[in-house]
Amino acid sequence: MGSNSGRTTKLPLVPLPKGSVLLPGITLRIPVSNRPDLANLLSTIVDRSAVAKRDGTAITFGCVPLSSPYLSKDGQRLIDDGSLDEDRREEFDMIDAGQSRKEDLFRHGTIGKVIGIQRRAYSEPALVVQGVQRFTIRRVLKERPFFEAEAVVHDEKVSGDAETVELFQQLRQLSRELLTLLRLSSLLPSPGSRLSPLIARKFELFITKSDVSHASRLADFMADVADSGFEEKLRILASLDVKIRLERVVEILTRQLQSIKSNVKVTTITTNSFPSSGFDINQIDPRDREILARKAMAGLSGLTPPGLSAGRNNDNDDKESNEVDELQQRLQEAQLSPEARKVADKELRRLRKMNPANAEYGVCRTYLENIADIPWTKMTEDQLGPETLKRARKQLDDDHYGLEKIKKRLLEYLAVLRLKQSTNRDVERQIESLSKELEASDGGDLEKEVPVLSETDRVAVETKLHMLKTRRMGDKSPILLLVGPPGVGKTSLARSVASSLGRKFHRISLGGVRDEAEIRGHRRTYVAAMPGLIVSGLKKVGVANPVFLLDEIDKVGGANFQGDPSAAMLEVLDPEQNHTFSDHYINIPIDLSKVLFIATANSLDTIPAPLLDRMETISLSGYTTVEKRHIAKRHLIPKQIRANGLSDGQVVLSDEVIDKIITSYTRESGVRNLERELGSVCRFKAVQFADAGDAGRLDAYNPVVSMDELEEILGIERFEEEIAEKHGRPGVVTGLVAYSTGGQGSILFIEVADMPGNGRVQLTGKLGDVLKESVEVALTWVKAHAFELGLTADPTEDIMKNRSLHVHCPSGAIPKDGPSAGLAHTMGLISLFTGKAVPPSVAMTGEVSLRGKVMPVGGIKEKLIGALRAGVKTVLLPHHNRKDVKDVPQEVSEGLEIVYVTHIWEAIRQVWPDAHWPGQHTHFIESRL
């Protein structure tokens, strides 16, 4: 029976890397990179080291492993995997030794003695520490800048009772069998990976010469050599009773030997002729013991584990091993998800056993490098301070003029993010308080005595804790689709969003993508397989919450023999699914819920309905003339002046000149052509400025661009603007039109003429089918109400008898279509038949029905701007379009008199207020349908 006594001392502590346990008599490398606590500890004891050397003692500190969620902190009770809370598992996976708290430490540790500093090529420096003596933490005195605790150091004594002696003999027998297996060269494929005869001889001498007084050291040594798990080593460290420790090590060795023998047919050889004199464990070189342990843990795979080489002079093996060590360090720093950690550990074990010359070695290493490059948990912290919304609004306004809808939606998202962050902060504080209370009752608080909670109180606290965890608000970023014509700033707007949020930005061009594998990656079985565009983008930005621009999503290829790329985007753009997005190459769930996706498209027609349903659509209309003028003055003109080598003030364009360029030389929804034309103007002035400078007459240079110069610079006008007539005439009405290219509107004259005939109606002006039907509806209404309008003397008389009509819309080369000219056609027919002229300062738009109702139409904003520019004073609009006038610039709404009508009779009274119509009081009751 082993016993131990202890003495209390104050001890600095060093948390060991995750998965590492230091036992007495064993050496361990502790990397010093990314370990501020270790650096602070070493700098603190560096003064003591001089004194220590004079006293003949070494530098020592306590080496404490991190606790395991599957084992109680005292190492005596295993926790069932099924009962383990998922949050505790994830919390353990995220623990880093350099950032650990006292709650993360195991209760037992080993005093370590620094025996050297090791630095290999291509590898980080590390302290080489040898375990000396077990200790138990009583209470932690401080956590920062390094841990310091009050600990009980245990002095071990091994009793010589029969049961202990029997266990010791059994341990020696099992150790010999393991040594025999290690020495069988037939199990090892290459001479370079065989166990060195010198190391084997030292190992054999140590096992044979050990007597029962060395039982504790032999048990610790074999526990480190054997293929034991992290929790098993923690239990051995916590076994202060030598007898219990022997039982556990015997169990581990028995299991490992049975596993080896089940796979390989082995004849066991034992040796009995060894002297029984005492033997010191330090006779075995620490590096030799480390090599021996790593070979045993490799499971007799035949390959030397990374970080070690069988021969001392094998530089190539050292280089390959150090590369794998570096890869392991990168994986540890990557803070992988639990699923990714499990896969990475498995692949890393495979990589350690592979020969670097093996073709699969490069594939496996590339796969692990890709996993390490993915930002699993690293995120950009959103700038969500008190000035967040104000700063974001200013950023968006500085970068883009107009586009109020999308700006409003993005500011809403920022406000929601800020509120969620505030709520989560309060919830986390409550969770932390309850967790500490629960851990203290379990004996986790080492500093003070806390009464144990009753079962009822424990259940109540755990229930409240669970409810608080469900109150955490997740950040599901919206998935926005910006739809609009080319050149309106969809792509640059997404970049401004990232800038206002302070996030990384990445653009993915989807135009012409026809292979599903480009989105989701190729399977690892293919040669040169790589991740898809989404995962590659995450690797490039290096954070898990960037802004992704999916450009031209409407131009993604359809289904073909290579798959359907648009179908592959369904999982990416579904907020309910993309937190477990699976790339074919990585084949591990990746959380995309933190990514803010902004897609752009010119049209919705080619986007599949299921994909469109997953996105929040925001339509961006083309810029109006007023907006283009502001954009030109604030952005385009200064940009072109700088691009052409000029300075501010060397090119001056008045509002009149800018408007002339917009209306007469461009007709587009965006501003790309406008920028080109402004560039032409700047280059023209640059030539003039250069000529004046060469001639020494800079004072003669005129920076102002006049209207007369425009035709010389840009050529003849490409588009002629319609201007309102000064005099009205019967049959001519001013309508309103919004160009299909978007962004611009104008007036459109509708001319109606009659002639003797047989009732035929002729339509010219390149009119579309809908516009032709609109003329027919207008004519039918006028014919049906000819008596009420005073056009016929009898209700049964046909106004079209012996008469034919010709309806024409000027600018015959331009296609025209749509129902919005119905009201103008009706008023034109009434004007022709009554001989009353429609005032030229009045324009109108609206669809009409056979009942005479005026129904809403689109393009109101563009039409009103065009009407004001053409000199119109009054505009008749459908009553249901009142809501659209809110989007009109203030200068337009104030410059026009806007009249809303619901019926043709209301429009008639507005156009001819002084005229009398026989049936104007009965039109709401009477119906001719």
From Swiss-Prot:
Stretches assigned to the Lon proteolytic domain: 727-914
Molecular function per GO: ATP binding; ATP hydrolysis activity; ATP-dependent peptidase activity; serine-type endopeptidase activity
GO biological process: protein import into peroxisome matrix; protein processing; protein quality control for misfolded or incompletely synthesized proteins
This enzyme's EC code(s): 3.4.21.53
SMART domains xrefs: AAA (SM00382), LON (SM00464)
SUPFAM superfamilies, A to Z: P-loop containing nucleoside triphosphate hydrolases, PUA domain-like, Ribosomal protein S5 domain 2-like
Catalytic activity as recorded in UniProt: Hydrolysis of proteins in presence of ATP
Binding positions (ATP): 484-491
Keyword annotations: ATP-binding, Hydrolase, Nucleotide-binding, Peroxisome, Protease, Serine protease
Cellular compartment(s): Peroxisome matrix
A GO cellular-component term linked to this record: peroxisomal matrix
Pfam families: AAA, Lon_C, Lon_lid, LON_substr_bdg
Motif, Microbody targeting signal: chain positions: 927-929
Keyword Transmembrane helix belongs to the record: no
Residues annotated as catalytic: 820, 863
All copies of domain Lon N-terminal, residue ranges: 11-257
Stretch list, region Disordered: 302-325
Family according to the record: Belongs to the peptidase S16 family.
Known function: ATP-dependent serine protease that mediates the selective degradation of misfolded and unassembled polypeptides in the peroxisomal matrix. Necessary for type 2 peroxisome targeting signal (PTS2)-containing protein processing and facilitates peroxisome matrix protein import.
Protein name from the UniProt record: Lon protease homolog 2, peroxisomal
